[in-house]
């Protein structure tokens, strides 16, 4: 069973709900990718997510754009998940520096900003 479901699409988070531990977390984007004609109303999907005790719902695309690039949406999601991962925030920051370091300091800074933006949604 899963400790967390991390999803860039809210309906997808519900698809994997049977695998989530009773005390697990769902961290999901609030904006759906509507790719089927009978996609349920967004409000209904989010209402189902909200039934899970431990949930975080955020508008990943808007936050990523505010940070400076829609390409960092996945790092925004990671930031929102950090309080529940059991890994120190500093270790995650170091991982980002390591992974993106070869792309230059500007890319590292952008991703660290995205990480913090995601985390700040949870720490409000």
Feature map (PLM): residue ranges:
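Active-site cofactor/cluster-binding pocket
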Residues: 1-124
């Amino acid at each position: 069973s899963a400790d967390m479901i991390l999803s860039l699409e809210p309906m997808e988070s519900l698809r994997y709900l049977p695998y989530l531990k009773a005390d697990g977390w769902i961290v999901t984007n609030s904006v759906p990718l509507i790719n089927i004609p009978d996609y349920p109303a967004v409000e209904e999907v989010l209402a189902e997510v909200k039934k899970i005790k431990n949930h975080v719902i955020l508008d990943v695309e808007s936050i990523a754009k505010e940070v400076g690039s829609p390409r960092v949406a996945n790092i925004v999601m990671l930031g929102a998940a950090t309080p529940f991962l059991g890994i120190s925030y500093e270790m995650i920051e170091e991982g980002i520096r390591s992974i993106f370091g070869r792309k230059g300091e500007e890319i590292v800074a952008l991703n660290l900003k995205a990480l913090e933006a995601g985390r700040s949604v949870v720490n409000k």
